[in-house]
């Protein structure tokens, strides 16, 4: 692979959904590659068949496509260093592990599960951290060959140096050193011949020419072992960028198991993909310089200004209110046509009668923060809800149930006029305004009761004349007459 070009990879496991933290890793990995005019690779890590979920690979593909994080090499489009699915690369890992055995940097371990369980139980009883005791680390070559020939089950373990320290540099966390004596002889190849996650990871990253590894800070503790593998093979170590965890609050990590929202959940609730991506980028990263105060960024803008130096060491707290505010800003920036296209599926969930959707959307857009909250605002269109006439009382508008009856009776002939075009909102408003002036009243005195009469609610997507134009003349007149009757009650 060319050594001067940045190559990054997003390597998810197909477990069924896209965590917010996973999507952030994918985004940072994409930005790192694209900012440097490099290559973004998708690799599916499916060696843990116990956690594999049918259809999960499609979730990964769909999420990345929806968010615009398009890969340059991957399982579906191929590339020069495929296959890009780990389970399709099985044949190559064992030969690398056996190479380390031949060089004295790894060894065959024949310890049974029972022995290891007893060892760990004893260590726990003594208040020790559980670890492998090196029982098979220095077996004579003849004994190893004899046991292999007899078909005895084995794993291959990495021979970690017992002395010295292993250090590495991380872009976010700086220089980190670990005493080799504190590291376990990790398993590289399991008894079934499958590689462990850590081993496959290192081999694949090398063979795919990965230059920058971006992942969660939970992998910091494994990184010295990764580096010892790179050193054992004589391979170039990539640049490490470890990201802080995404937290629900100060104590708890964001977790799907605890019912916290995945990317799919957020979209299903009516958050815009672009807003979610924008917000996720700011979870633990902040722009520098002239962009330091800016919060709204398109994906091309993020590519342009990206720098891993902006990643914080501190855990990022997922703030639903902040996401809401960013989503509301994205909604406000949509063209009226774009908003209507996105809002209509939500409108159709609540409204099954004929209404002026264009006018409804013009009223919804400035007020809407999350698309999924649209249906609950529109439940009065299909059927008039029960309401109490005390709702007509409003100090600001100087209305009471008594004045409301007077106002609605004054409006009835105005709204009944066949010459009045309900398709022209301004014309309807001007006609109502003229009636208010004729009565010597303010507009609100007349129009606040109209809104209640048409919706049975104090908060609606639009004022009285807007609602009348959305519903049309027939429904408007029927509801105004029903309201007058109710007030006569």
Description of each model-found segment:
Residues 336-439:
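Small-residue-rich helix-loop
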Residues 83-87, 110, 189-190, 208-219, ...:
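Conserved phosphate-binding loops in nucleotide/dinucleotide-binding enzymes
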Residues 2-125, 222-235, 275:
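N-terminal Rossmann-like or analogous alpha/beta NTP/dinucleotide-binding catalytic cores
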Residues 29, 60, 100, 104, ...:
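Residue-level signal for inorganic ion chemistry
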Residues 426-488:
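Charged substrate- and nucleic-acid-binding regions of tRNA-handling and nucleotidyl-transfer enzymes
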Residues 34-46, 199-212, 233-247, 461-466, ...:
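Glycine-rich phosphate/pyrophosphate-binding loops
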Residues 18-20, 266-274, 313-319, 352-360, ...:
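Structural motif
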Residues 102, 107-242, 248-254, 262:
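Active-site cores that bind ATP or allylic diphosphates and position pyrophosphate for catalysis
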């Amino acid at each position: 692979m060319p050594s001067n070009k940045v190559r990054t990879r997003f390597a998810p496991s197909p477990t069924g959904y896209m965590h917010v933290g996973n999507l952030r890793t994918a985004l940072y990995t994409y930005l790192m590659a694209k900012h440097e005019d490099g290559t973004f690779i998708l690799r599916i890590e499916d060696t843990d068949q116990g956690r594999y979920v049918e259809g999960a690979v499609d979730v990964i593909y769909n999420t990345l496509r929806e968010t615009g994080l398009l890969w340059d090499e991957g399982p579906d489009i191929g590339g020069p260093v495929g296959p890009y699915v780990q389970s399709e690369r099985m044949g190559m890992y064992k030969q690398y592990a056996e190479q380390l055995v031949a060089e004295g940097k790894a060894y065959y371990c024949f310890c049974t599960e029972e022995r290891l369980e007893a060892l760990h139980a004893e260590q726990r009883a003594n208040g020790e951290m559980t670890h492998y005791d090196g029982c098979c680390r220095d077996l004579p070559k003849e004994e190893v060959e004899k046991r292999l020939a007899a078909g005895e089950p084995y794993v291959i373990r990495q021979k970690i140096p017992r002395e010295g320290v292993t250090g590495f540099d991380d872009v976010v966390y700086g220089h980190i050193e670990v005493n080799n004596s504190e590291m376990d002889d990790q398993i590289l190849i399991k008894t079934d011949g499958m590689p462990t996650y850590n081993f496959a990871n290192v081999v694949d990253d090398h063979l795919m020419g990965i230059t920058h590894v971006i992942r969660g800070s939970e992998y910091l503790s494994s990184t010295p072992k990764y580096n010892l593998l790179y050193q054992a093979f004589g391979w170039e170590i990539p640049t490490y960028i470890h990201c802080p965890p995404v937290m629900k609050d100060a104590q708890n990590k964001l977790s799907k198991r605890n019912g916290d929202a995945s990317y799919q959940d957020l979209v299903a609730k009516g958050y815009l993909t672009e807003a979610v991506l924008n917000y996720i980028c700011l979870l633990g990263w902040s722009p520098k310089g002239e962009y330091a105060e800016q919060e709204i960024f398109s994906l091309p803008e993020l590519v342009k200004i990206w720098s891993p130096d902006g990643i914080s060491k501190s855990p990022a707290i997922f703030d639903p209110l902040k996401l809401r505010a960013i989503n509301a800003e994205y909604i406000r920036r949509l063209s009226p046509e774009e908003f209507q296209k996105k809002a209509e599926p939500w409108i159709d969930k609540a409204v099954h009668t004929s209404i002026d959707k264009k006018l409804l959307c013009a009223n919804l857009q400035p007020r809407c923060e999350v698309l999924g909250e649209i249906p609950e605002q529109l439940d009065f269109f299909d059927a008039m809800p029960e309401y109490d006439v005390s709702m007509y009382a409003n100090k600001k508008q100087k209305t009471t149930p008594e004045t409301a009856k007077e106002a609605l009776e004054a409006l009835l002939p105005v709204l009944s006029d066949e010459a009045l075009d309900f398709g022209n909102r301004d014309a309807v408003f001007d006609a109502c305004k003229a009636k208010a002036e004729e009565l010597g009243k303010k507009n609100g005195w007349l129009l606040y009761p109209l809104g209640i009469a048409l919706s049975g609610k104090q908060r609606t997507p639009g004022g009285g004349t807007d609602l009348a134009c959305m519903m049309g003349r027939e429904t408007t007149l029927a509801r105004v007459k029903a309201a007058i009757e109710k007030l006569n009650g």
